[in-house]
Design a protein with these regions (language model features):
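Active-site beta-strand termini and strand-to-loop segments that position acidic
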Residues: 41-46, 97-100, 110
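Short glycine-enriched loop/turn motifs at secondary-structure junctions
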Residues: 1-2, 58-63, 88-89
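Short solvent-exposed loop/turn micro-motifs enriched in small/polar/acidic residues
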Residues: 32-35, 88-90, 109
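Vicinal oxygen chelate
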Residues: 11-13, 66-104, 112
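Conserved beta-strand in the GNAT
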Residues: 49-52, 96, 105-108
Length: 112
């Protein structure tokens, strides 16, 4: 199995775009047919992250947990305005933050 699409629905689409852009996503505005305008970013050549406006005020899927590998965790935390102290783990430096909708996002900096 290979994941190729993640769709996040939100009532804070611009805040979400800013947050995930700070993590390295490069979004383009899209619209498919009569569907809503949304943002899409291709990650790692074949995984697409899309930000869509919430339908009828539905709550975001706050139970979702995303993991993002970053090059410099301290710089990333500063760029998203988070003051969490990263912890050393067996996988590298790790910090857990929340996106503007409250989803858990785990940041990981692999160390050699």
């Amino acid at each position: 199995m290979k994941l190729n699409l993640i769709v996040l629905r939100t009532t804070r689409i611009e805040e979400m775009r800013t947050f995930y852009s700070a993590l390295g996503a490069r979004f383009e505005k899209e619209r498919h047919g009569n569907g809503p305008e949304h943002y899409a970013a291709t990650l790692d050549d074949d995984l697409v992250l899309e930000l869509y406006p919430s339908v009828d005020g539905a709550m975001p899927d706050s139970g979702l947990r995303l993991g993002v590998r970053v090059d410099n965790i301290e710089e990333t935390l500063r760029s998203i305005g988070q003051s969490v102290a990263p912890r050393q783990t067996q996988w590298g430096l790790r910090a857990v933050v929340r996106d503007p909708d409250g989803r858990t996002v785990e940041l990981l900096q692999i160390q050699s």
